[in-house]
Amino acid sequence: TTAAVVLAQMFVAAPFYIRAARAGFESVDQRLEAVSSTLGARPWRTFRRITVPLALPSLAGGAVMAWARALGEFGATIMFAGNVAGRTQTMPLAILEAMEADANAAIAIAVVLAGIALAVLIAFRGLARAGSRAL
């Protein structure tokens, strides 16, 4: 099912995001959070207005790493969800299947996948630059 594909992708990609998020949150200066508290901000507001914005570059980087890892995943997807065309088949699985029958089709799918990945990474880079200018 589609849910099995999502779970398989999350299982494989989550450690990449968690590691980056943890590093981002650990890099936030606790003195800034303490100052926010002394000025009367509640913990949730401190988290939302101080901690998350300062950790955002790491959170975004972790999301990109997790996405990139999930994009190329096929082992866990085959094990958990199978390889049913039109239902649970991801692009890497389609490439794998096409390699057995038609190498040109596999190359075409791989080029499309690489184009999608490149477009997303370029868009992320543009957003990251815009975000760094806003800070």
Predicted regions and their residues:
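Loop-to-helix entry region at the N-terminal start of transmembrane alpha-helices
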Residues: 1-16
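C-terminal transmembrane helix and the adjacent membrane-cytosol boundary/short C-terminal tail
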Residues: 15, 19-37, 41, 107-135
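Juxtamembrane helix-start elements in MFS-like secondary transporters
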Residues: 1, 46-47, 106
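Short, contiguous hydrophobic alpha-helices characteristic of membrane insertion segments
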Residues: 3-6, 63-68, 78, 120-125
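Interhelical loop and adjacent transmembrane-helix boundary motif
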Residues: 78-118, 123
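Hydrophobic core positions of alpha-helical segments in small-molecule transporters
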Residues: 7, 47-52, 80, 109-112
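Transmembrane alpha-helices
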Residues: 11, 18-21, 25, 29, ...
